């Protein structure tokens, strides 16, 4: 909306919002729900864990789905994709660095309408 490229007529098919967030729980790379450590103690200093996440502002920016998709031939919607990053976590009573799932982008998913 207020991004400079919008002045050039360029628009994203899916609007996203990015922010630094904290987490209390997450899904690890094995699919387990783990507790994310709020504070990390390294060299007698306490650090807070932050994660940079990108999420969809709206799963349907247009009534027909993603912006700019021909809705007469395609069904579409916006959804988040993710990646794995390391975080200090607890599973049971064991603390360790694990890869956890973080939302990193908002993308458009399309499927061809049947009968066209």
Swiss-Prot record:
Chief location of this protein within or outside the cell: secreted
GO BP terms: cell surface receptor protein tyrosine kinase signaling pathway; modulation of chemical synaptic transmission; negative regulation of neuron apoptotic process; nerve development; nerve growth factor signaling pathway; neuron projection morphogenesis
Keyword annotations of the record: Disulfide bond, Growth factor, Lipid-binding, Metalloenzyme inhibitor, Metalloprotease inhibitor, Protease inhibitor, Secreted, Toxin
Localization annotation: Secreted
GO CC term (a single one): synaptic vesicle
Tissue specificity remark: Expressed by the venom gland.
Database matches in Gene3D superfamilies: Cystine-knot cytokines
InterPro entries, per database record: Cystine-knot_cytokine, Nerve_growth_factor-like, Nerve_growth_factor-rel, Nerve_growth_factor_bsu, Nerve_growth_factor_CS
PTM text: Not glycosylated.
Pfam family, one: NGF
GO molecular function: growth factor activity; lipid binding; metalloendopeptidase inhibitor activity; nerve growth factor receptor binding; toxin activity
The organism's place on the tree of life at top rank: Eukaryota
Cited PANTHER family: BETA-NERVE GROWTH FACTOR (PTHR11589:SF10), NERVE GROWTH FACTOR NGF -RELATED (PTHR11589)
Role, per record: Nerve growth factor is important for the development and maintenance of the sympathetic and sensory nervous systems. It stimulates division and differentiation of sympathetic and embryonic sensory neurons as well as basal forebrain cholinergic neurons in the brain. Its relevance in the snake venom is not clear. However, it has been shown to inhibit metalloproteinase-dependent proteolysis of platelet glycoprotein Ib alpha, suggesting a metalloproteinase inhibition to prevent metalloprotease autodigestion and/or protection against prey proteases.
Assembly description: Homodimer; non-covalently linked.
UniProt-recorded name of the protein: Venom nerve growth factor
Species per Swiss-Prot/TrEMBL record: Naja naja (Indian cobra)
């Amino acid at each position: 909306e207020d991004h400079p490229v919008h002045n050039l007529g360029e628009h994203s098919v899916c609007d996203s919002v990015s922010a630094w967030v904290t987490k209390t729980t997450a899904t690890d790379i094995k699919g387990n729900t783990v507790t994310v450590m709020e504070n990390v103690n390294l060299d007698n200093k306490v650090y807070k864990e932050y994660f940079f996440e990108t999420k969809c502002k709206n799963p349907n920016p247009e009534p027909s789905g993603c912006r700019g998709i021909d809705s007469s031939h395609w069904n579409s919607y916006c959804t988040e994709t993710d990646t794995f990053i390391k975080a200090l976590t607890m599973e049971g009573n064991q603390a360790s660095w694990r890869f956890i799932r973080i939302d990193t982008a908002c993308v458009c998913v399309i499927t061809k309408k049947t009968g066209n």
